[in-house]
Amino acid sequence: LAYSLCRYIGRQCEVVEQDWDGMIPALQMRKFDAIMAGMSITDERKKVITFSQGYADEVAALAVMKGSSLEGMSTPVGISLSKPNSDAKKALKTITAALAGKTVCTQTGTIHQNFLESGDVGKVNVRTYKTQDEVNLDLTAGRCDVALAAAVAFTDYAEKSGKPVVLVGPTFSGGAFGNGVGVGLRQASQLGGTLGARDAELLKAFNKAIDQARKDGVISRLAIKHFGFDASM
């Protein structure tokens, strides 16, 4: 998708790798110009960077190994934490009881870690990892009772590895999980001058490109191709 958006804005882009927990500081230090790494748009992140409009709706989910005692956890299919209704509140109570005393693994510096440490699901033993690959490996090795990440991270891993990883409980969205996924950019208002103007123009260009990519069905097609479902917004 990054290359597609770059074509829409008429730029030749280079994709570089960056550790997740250093992503925002590296952007602010101008090591690169934009973040396209499945970063959810949250109020906390908007304090330090700017986001384009959302282009994908990424939901979070809990995952266990097949045969786990948590596999049969019964809750609604999906809940929104932006305006939790009675079903959402009931689901959170069910999850809180199920996770009591369990070790929950997640990637460090993510909205998933923030949610687990917020107290919304009680006091759980949170174990963090630098990468999602490490989370997946320890889940399959039995060092995690359950893991929390973007649902697609688990379904993709299960498909490629053949490991019996299954999703349990509801999917989560809204609230601490943000309002979709967007392109992360530097805050032009904090820079001013030529650099600030450049970043402001880049934001406009990405928003326009996302509009066109959505209209052309590019985002939808890429989501279905790589994730198996339409995650476009």
Across the structure, where does each feature detected by a protein language model lie?
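Solvent-exposed loop/turn segments at secondary-structure junctions
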Residues: 21-23, 40-44, 58, 68-70, ...
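Short, well-ordered beta-strand segments
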Residues: 103-106, 147, 184, 194
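Acidic, polar ligand-binding/catalytic clefts
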Residues: 3, 7, 12-94, 165-180
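A ligand-binding cleft/hinge motif common to bilobed small-molecule-binding domains
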Residues: 22, 38-48, 114-119, 140-141, ...
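Periplasmic-binding protein-like
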Residues: 57-64, 159-207, 209-233
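Hydrophobic residues within well-ordered alpha-helices
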Residues: 5, 27-28, 138-140, 206
